[in-house]
Curated annotation (Swiss-Prot):
Protein's organism: Escherichia coli O157:H7
Signal peptide positions on this chain: none
Keywords from the UniProt entry: Amino-acid transport, Antiport, Cell inner membrane, Cell membrane, Membrane, Transmembrane, Transmembrane helix, Transport, Virulence
InterPro entries: AA/rel_permease1 (IPR002293), APC_superfamily (IPR050367), Glu_antiport (IPR004759)
Protein's UniProt name: Glutamate/gamma-aminobutyrate antiporter
Entries under PANTHER family matching the protein: AMINO ACID TRANSPORTER-RELATED, GLUTAMATE_GAMMA-AMINOBUTYRATE ANTIPORTER-RELATED
Amino acid sequence: MATLVQTGKAKQLTLLGFFAITASMVMAVYEYPTFATSGFSLVFFLLLGGILWFIPVGLCAAEMATVDGWEEGGVFAWVSNTLGPRWGFAAISFGYLQIAIGFIPMLYFVLGALSYILKWPALNEDPITKTIAALIILWALALTQFGGTKYTARIAKVGFFAGILLPAFILIALAAIYLHSGAPVAIEMDSKTFFPDFSKVGTLVVFVAFILSYMGVEASATHVNEMSNPGRDYPLAMLLLMVAAICLSSVGGLSIAMVIPGNEINLSAGVMQTFTVLMSHVAPEIEWTVRVISALLLLGVLAEIASWIVGPSRGMYVTAQKNLLPAAFAKMNKNGVPVTLVISQLVITSIALIILTNTGGGNNMSFLIALALTVVIYLCAYFMLFIGYIVLVLKHPDLKRTFNIPGGKGVKLVVAIVGLLTSIMAFIVSFLPPDNIQGDSTDMYVELLVVSFLVVLALPFILYAVHDRKGKANTGVTLEPINSQNAPKGHFFLHPRARSPHYIVMNDKKH
């Protein structure tokens, strides 16, 4: 039967060291156009999400990750130990399923970049063309990963620097030159526009995109066990991450909002739209470089998608190891890839992609539904995380843990309740149609989102109810937790949501 090897961890991770291995989550270039649709109030939304949601998630997850015996297994272990195995299975399943849907807006971004490079608008506008191209890209990337993940982290590292970091800094630099030149700005930036118009509920829907940009921090919480002084350094690391996310996302989103009017922003190709306008203003003689930058962005997001294909399935593998999934899901190929889990996830992505692209028109509505669906699925896992933490505080205060939220029981409960209420607010708002979706499309938006969500919501509970868990999945596989000392090169350039939490050891070979 598969086993989990406990590994000793040197307590030598500093504040800056923890920040460095988590910082990849603050770069979300493909979300900048969505941020930009809220104008200057995007800064308000980033602050709101950071203070009321990101910090509570990080603090609650860190305390749960340092409870004796809970150090490995992530949200599955935390929720299982507080709410029971059914809910633990559901929580990790929602993390697995949100990745399946989260691939869709990333693929839309890829197609937006390709349409600019190839000068082929149908690739970003025609639903059938868009569907076929996205499916080809998705499964082609998957095939590259079935051969093993030996080079995945290195590819992610190159993609992060060349395809995400470099274009982001070029975007910001061009926007600064544009602003300094006195060119017209598409938004007003003052105290009045800092706050969104709360009388228009549709303007608040964009908040889900900001919550999505903060999601995944709980995946790095296990590394708190490696910190030399977690009580002092971890809260500071969370603040640094929040400040970095707010600064980078604000500047990136505003770079687009200043140049492209909100009602003209294409959510899939908005970054390329902006580069075109900026380059034609700053250096029209080298406007051809927009296609080069688009190619860099394309490669960056392709590398990101490729690196996300196997990691979450390896995380889900722990449930197959505990026989919470049928034995077929515990099967590995010779390269240490849980093929059944990976293929199942990609089938879900493909079905959702076909439905959303062709019923949503393949335009901004498809992008927004995919984004909102990703968020509401993932929020279900966070509901359980916060409720599990409240149970831990109220019923198990005696359990030893390395990190405690400072301030005692009252502060702990306030932090968890604030995070839970913010999650509930984001969940409700997600089902409201945005302002840029009008007429009959609003009904279609809500219907597609609600039906899709209910189907995904039911999957883990149906599977748990019908599967006979009496047998044992005999896989001959050992799981070795990954930490800051034994991680493969480039591992920490992956977004925390996409990282495999452990090595797969088969026949004395580590994958």
